[in-house]
């Protein structure tokens, strides 16, 4: 759990808020909040570089603001540090699905196959077309 009153904490609060707005179909409003989160995440990344959780959220918030190239870069940086990070593997897999790189998405799924985690099923459902990416 992130420490209160840190840039990372401030970013996570905004990401949760943006996800709620997105779930209600308020996409443009959610993108503004994701952009606010990014400002905090860039500061957090400067203060604590090489933190896979920060890199995961940098990838996530960039993807949510349609900046797929930067999102992929941050996800890949995070995987260099922690190749089995569940969140990064799921979200990068979803990015690969939305950019029509199913083979790469399946590679991420393969990494998650033994994790006994929600991320495996979430990504599998997105790859199989059972559901659209929740995030």
Locations of regions flagged by a protein language model:
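Terminal, low-structured helical/coil segments at or just beyond the last alpha-helical repeat
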Residues: 4, 106-135
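Structural marker of alpha-solenoid helical repeat scaffolds
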Residues: 47, 81, 112-115
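Residue-level recognition of tetratricopeptide repeat
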Residues: 51, 85, 117-120
